[in-house]
């Protein structure tokens, strides 16, 4: 059986359209930086009051798989 280890990081996405779009914005950006994203958890949803409108804000914890220990050992660092 393959053993896996995951790490979670907190990010915040915003949108002037909807909570769903704020989530999509956050996940899209995380995919540009983090490899092997596996899942996310919505930690908090809130709204900002802007002059003339609303800002939807969503705090997410996104989880990604850490590289295998063998690969980390050969490179000297854990990615």
Describe the role of every protein-language-model region.
Residues 2-40:
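Short, well-ordered alpha-helical segments
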Residues 41, 45-79:
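A cross-kingdom feature marking charged/low-complexity
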């Amino acid at each position: 059986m393959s053993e896996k280890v995951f790490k979670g990081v907190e990010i915040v996405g915003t949108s002037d359209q909807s909570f769903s779009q704020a989530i999509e914005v956050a996940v899209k950006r995380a995919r540009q930086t983090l490899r092997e994203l596996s899942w996310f958890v919505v930690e908090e949803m809130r709204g900002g009051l802007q002059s003339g409108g609303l800002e939807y804000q969503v705090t997410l914890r996104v989880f990604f798989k850490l590289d295998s220990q063998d690969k980390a050992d050969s490179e000297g660092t854990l990615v």
